[in-house]
Swiss-Prot record:
Interacts with CELA2A. Interacts with ERGIC3 and LMAN1/ERGIC53. Interacts with PRSS1/Trypsin. GO terms for molecular function: serine-type endopeptidase inhibitor activity. Keywords: Glycoprotein, Phosphoprotein, Protease inhibitor, Secreted, Serine protease inhibitor, Signal. SUPFAM superfamilies: Serpins. InterPro entries: Serpin_CS (IPR023795), Serpin_dom (IPR023796), Serpin_fam (IPR000215), Serpin_sf (IPR036186), Serpin_sf_1 (IPR042178), Serpin_sf_2 (IPR042185). This is Alpha-1-antiproteinase. Inhibits human leukocyte elastase, pig pancreatic elastase and bovine trypsin on a 1:1 molar basis. The record marks M380, S381 as: Reactive bond. It is found in: Secreted.
Length: 416
């Protein structure tokens, strides 16, 4: 008799294991009771931050290897959070593969500490802040005929702030609409039509989204934006709206990367790091940039005058992460050998797809109402022109949690 394998779907959207007892229960009074253990949670959050950064660069390198002519944009926090949540229902080698593929060494960092870290990370990112719009959420859509393990539902709710929804996957169109509506609402309309088609054999869909909308501490003046050339490669040049500001910046030239490194703060706790390699040095930048270098850039402050040109853009990218994560060692969960019996014991389960969609918009908007003007003192000597008119990297980093929210490469700003 043939073994019947039912399907689970992992969906991740971005803008800008189990023991018989509940892991949340094990952590009760520690990670779950935030008022008594905030410091412990924060420490756990900072413990997983280097792993998240290393995971981000691992994903980046895999995507860059696939194509050097396409934009790259993804949220490592969204991907890691979703798979950490999935690990709560995985067992045996499936469970180990997921956590090790995310970059965690289980002999150095206990699993409970990993989930405490994600719990605090998600809690911190979702704190109301009128200065920036940053929201993240996890939704678990369960086929109405399926019976999920209670401890799994309890864990994903308490540790990963997940909501569970009953859904009829046999009505594929209606199920698709409900999932897409959930993501569109959570991302404030920025992520639409994440799911294009659904398999009727799907038993559950795990959905993660992250949406960020920030305001520059020092905005660009709209009237200074002009159309200029962006050199995609030696053969291709496109016209793009280029923002411009003359002033003081956290900007320096890194000899090791042969690149300009620019940090622009948003109001709140998020910093954007833009890295512009010299002509012909993009490969050198990609080969040498790592978590340690990024941490140094974020720690040390520079004050340099410059005439800055930065493209105004709106890009989005969609990935099926099955291949990329497979190269990082996460294979079993996508195969007939998956052990997800911590999610449901009724039937064998595997993940059929892991879709991730991320969108980035960069524009002039600042912290003040229209017409506000910033005046800065700059040296009398002529400042250098720093023009992001060729492929560059960008990393959005949350300073509170020390985590990379988004990582990307802009090859062509006109590529939607």
């Amino acid at each position: 008799m043939a073994l019947s394998i039912t399907r689970g779907l992992l969906l991740l959207a971005a803008l800008c294991c189990l023991a018989p007892t509940s892991l949340a229960g094990v952590l009760q009074g520690h990670a779950v009771q935030e008022t008594d253990d905030t410091a412990h949670q924060e420490a756990a959050c900072h413990k997983i931050a280097p792993n998240l950064a290393n995971f981000a660069f691992s994903i980046y390198h895999k995507l860059a290897h696939q194509s050097n002519t396409s934009n790259i944009f993804f949220s490592p926090v969204s991907i890691a959070s979703a798979f950490a949540m999935l690990s709560l229902g995985a067992k045996g080698n499936t469970h180990t593969e997921i956590l090790e593929g995310l970059g965690f060494n289980l002999t150095e960092l206990a699993e409970a500490e990993i989930h405490k870290g994600f719990q605090h990370l998600l809690h911190t990112l979702n704190q109301p802040n009128h200065q920036l719009q940053l929201t993240t959420g996890n939704g678990l859509f369960i086929n109405e005929s399926a019976k999920l393990v209670d401890t799994f539902l309890e864990d994903v709710k308490n540790l990963h702030h997940s909501k569970a929804f009953s859904i009829n996957f046999r009505d594929a169109e209606e199920a698709k609409k409900k999932i897409n509506d959930y993501v569109e609402k959570g991302s404030h309309g920025k992520i639409v039509d994440l799911v294009k088609d659904l398999d009727q054999d799907t038993v559950f869909a795990l959905v993660n989204y992250i949406s960020f909308k920030g305001k520059w501490e020092k905005p660009f003046e709209v009237e200074h934006t002009t159309e200029r050339d962006f050199h995609v490669n030696e053969q291709t040049t496109v016209k793009v709206p280029m923002m411009n500001r003359l002033g003081m910046f956290d900007l320096h030239y890194c000899d090791k990367l042969a690149s300009w490194v620019l940090l622009l703060d948003y109001v709140g706790n998020v910093t954007a790091c833009f890295i512009l390699p010299d002509l012909g040095k993009l490969q050198q930048l990609e080969d040498k940039l790592n978590n340690e270098l990024l941490a140094k850039f974020l720690e040390k402050k520079y004050a340099s005058s410059a005439n800055l040109h930065l493209p105004k853009l709106s890009i989005s990218e969609t990935y099926d992460l099955k291949t990329v994560l497979g190269e990082l060692g996460i294979n079993r969960v996508f195969s007939n050998g998956a052990d997800l019996s911590g999610i449901t014991e009724e039937q064998p389960l595997m993940v059929s797809k892991a879709l991730h969609k991320a969108a980035l918009t960069i524009d002039e908007k600042g912290t003040e109402a229209a017409g506000a003007t910033f005046l800065e003192a700059i040296p009398m000597s002529l400042p250098p022109d720093v023009e992001f008119n060729r492929p560059f990297l960008c990393i959005l980093y949350d300073r509170n949690t020390k985590s990379p929210l988004f990582v990307g490469k802009v090859v062509n700003p006109t590529q939607a």
